[in-house]
Regions:
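Acidic, Ser/Thr/Pro-rich regulatory low-complexity segments at or just upstream of the first helical elements
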Residues: 1-101, 110-157
């Protein structure tokens, strides 16, 4: 208990009298952020992949940036999309024929989190030139969410 008080004191001692600073929650917030750091991707996660390589990931990211711009999405959406992809690839292997599906499903998830008007699933099938149907996108969305334990965001630095 003493350590918690010391952390709160050290972090927010200048704001301890400000009710808007909600210093009572500092310890809980820092614990949450420390726990969330554990969800970051492994550093060398691409070495774990057997059917894809870093160049393929780069091509996917370039394509997603183009899609992001075409749909006029917010900057945080593309950042979250890439973070979701990296966290998923850090935990699961994927076949190269599913990599674009992973990307579009991650964009779909991120856009629902960040955008006021996210694209519809039909837009996701359209941008893949109908390589995947709506059910494929929705199934991959659920696969990703389950793998990430429904934790969409994690610290990125």
């Amino acid at each position: 208990m003493k350590r918690q008080r010391d952390v709160r004191y050290a972090v927010d001692k200048d704001e301890s009298d400000d009710p808007q600073a909600v210093t009572d929650y500092v310890v809980d917030l820092y614990k949450y952020y420390r726990d969330a750091e554990e969800k970051r991707p492994m550093e060398l996660y691409m070495e774990f992949q057997q059917d894809i390589n870093p160049k393929m990931r780069g091509i996917l990211v370039d394509w997603l940036v183009e899609v992001h711009l075409k749909f006029k999405m917010l900057q945080p959406t593309i950042y979250l999309t890439i973070q979701i992809i990296d966290r998923y690839l850090s935990a699961k292997q994927i076949d190269r024929n599913k990599l674009q599906l992973l990307g579009v499903a991650a964009l779909f998830i991120a856009s629902k989190y960040e955008e006021i008007y996210p694209p519809e699933v039909a837009d996701c099938t359209y941008i893949t030139d109908h390589a995947y149907d709506a059910q494929d996108v929705l199934d991959m969305e659920m696969t990703i969410l389950r793998e990430l334990d429904w934790n969409i965001t994690a610290p990125n630095a």
